[in-house]
Amino acid sequence: METRRMLTALLLGSGLALAAAMPSVAADKVKAGVVRSMGGSPNFIGKEKGFFAEQGIDVDIVFFDSAQPIAIAVASGDCDVGATGVTAAFFNLASQGTLRIVASGTWERPGFQSIGFLVSNQAYAAGLHSLKDIGGKKGAITQSGTPLQYAIALAAEKYKVDYNTIQVLLLQSNPNVGTALTGGQTDFAVQTVVPAYSVVNKGGAKLLGWEGDELPPTQNEAFFTSTKMIDERGDVLKRYLVGYRKAMTYFHDAFADANDKRRDGPAANEVQEIAAKYLGQPLEQIKLGTPFFDSQGRLVEKDFVELAAWYKAQGMIKDVDVKAMIDRKNAIMVKPK
């Protein structure tokens, strides 16, 4: 009996030593490009909660100052995936067969905060109190051919303002837009929630309203990847998407009910703390604005078709086949709500 115990102990010890000596399987790395905004939340949550690690994925989050460079980075291979507003540059690159839309990003919906309209204190004092007053004014955004510029056009259409009378200032980065607002070099601006509140909370501008409340519901942000990623690392992409969609569900349930109406769930504070950590912003500021994410990142094709049509009307892109730009093997489609 004693001999048996000794042999068992020896075998167990050898097994443990062998297991310790064996190299662990390295996680597959994925570089995700995002703007420093709440639109990157699924990546923040997936990384922080271990949803990507569960799938054997190690995500490296890369921050950009604006949306356009993310499409270029993904197309060139500097990033594997991107999540941001769908720009004219995206459509131009996708039309060459380099990029594909895989899932939705933030949606513009009533009660949620994603894209905001701000007015400088000087312009407000001069009478610019609502979006119906933007005709003939200067409006600042980061770059041309973005959903931020599209939002100005949609506001002009709703309030019967001639879009061509608005002088759109292209200031390249959110800090530049904030400086222009504070200094009165622009009358109004369009920014996502985090940089918007960065200016408003310092008294540099006033909030006119949110696109989700002011304009019809629309979807103009997306999660996308390169055709090279789909073709050469398809298994990695699928596993990444499992973690990404799990994170989207976690975000959705933290701030929306089963009917997609705004409410705080049990995980609301936790998600806001995660966002504050990754964005380097005070928690109090993060709590001021919450975007909407569909629980599964479903896509509304019509919204992207209309966005592309507007870019084309402005001479920013040529004819593009939006349907061909969607990775239908991985995307989940849905009709407008």
What feature does the model see in each segment?
Residues 1-11:
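Bacterial N-terminal signal peptides that target proteins for export
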Residues 9-19:
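Bacterial N-terminal signal peptides
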Residues 18-26:
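Sec/Tat signal peptide C-region and signal peptidase I cleavage site
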Residues 231-316:
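Secondary-structure end/capping motifs
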